[in-house]
Amino acid sequence: MNVEIGQSDSGKDYVLTGKDNKILSYQTPDLQYTTLGKFIIYRLLHDRDVKILITGKGKTTGTGKTTLAIVLAKWINEVRNEIFNLNEQWHAKDYSFMDVWEYLEKYREAKPGDPLITDELEYMADKRRHMTNENVKFSQAWSILRYKNAVTLGTAPGLSDLEKRVIETADIWINVVHVGKANTYYLTFDDFEWEPIYRRLRQGQFKESICWDELNDENYQWLKQEKENLGVPGLDDNGQENQLEQSDLNKREREVKNSTVKEMLKLLYENSLHDSITQSDIADVCGVSQQQVSNLKRELEKDNEIPT
């Protein structure tokens, strides 16, 4: 592997890596000068959400997906502070989630450019999990929530672990090839072939890769501890399915559905979208009856949480 170090037109160092005298990729230590960084900045400047999926090559664990998510989140926070003249501090405990409801609540209150991490995203949006409706409803909400000018960074073992709704509304796919290095792609979805389409991000004629250093700060330690505390949803310490009482499961499912409906109604009214999405649409997304949506809407009106 040959490595050439030089300077770009911007004066920033870059690294060109190649094999057999053929350049394969372009790496720059400063995200601001990557195509990925420019894409994120463009979206923030034009009041657009950004949804980024971070996976590991061959679903390999321990490659630094969480570390990369934190590195990106901290950089995005610095950029948005400059763009929107803010002075926000980024801490994992305030901006990282492994619970559907907590993520949706934070998204509803998001400030411009808020970088939100959904670590272990497959547990929130796994196409095979049916223990409760939370996983399915997260993917449906993910596909609708597009207008808060926030950035969501979701980590997962691989794209195949995620529901179609999550993949088809994501903007960027970052595939970690080994510790400290990842390839970046634009991500779209072919509805006819029912499969994702990805196109490598480039610096001119060169394929773009991003690199990062090992991280062991308080944000990483907090997320690591959260994952240890959480374990694998739906499994016990021995990897066996937890047996929940059906009554408890039904109660939890109702709570999740009602909470999701209310939050969606609030979001729609806050963003003046209540006339473009019907109660029937909400009922379909949340898996409830249209009458239930109407009842919950009246509750919100009674509590003055949405206008009558």
Swiss-Prot record:
Region of interest (Disordered), residue spans: 231-252
Name listed for the protein in its UniProt record: Uncharacterized protein ORF16
Highest classification ranks of the organism: Viruses, Viruses incertae sedis, Halspiviridae, Salterprovirus, Salterprovirus His1
